[in-house]
């Protein structure tokens, strides 16, 4: 299930980047 694992990693990376993007936008 390599594609599934890659999608999972991408989702986690995106989720981790969202709070950072929000913080940069609000500061």
From Swiss-Prot:
Principal subcellular localization: secreted
Superkingdom as given in the UniProt entry: Eukaryota
Biased amino acid composition, Low complexity: 1-17
Gene Ontology CC: one annotated term: extracellular region
Signal peptide segment: none
Annotated spans, Disordered: 1-27
Protein localization: Secreted
Keywords on record: Behavior, Secreted
Tissue specificity of this protein: Main cells of the accessory glands of males (paragonial gland).
Function: Represses female sexual receptivity and stimulates oviposition. This peptide has a low activity.
Designated name of the protein: Paragonial peptide PS-1
Lineage summary: Eukaryota, Metazoa, Ecdysozoa, Arthropoda, Hexapoda
Gene this chain is encoded by: PapC
């Amino acid at each position: 299930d390599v594609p599934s694992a890659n999608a999972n990693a991408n989702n986690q990376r995106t989720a981790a980047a969202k709070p950072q993007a929000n913080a940069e936008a609000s500061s």
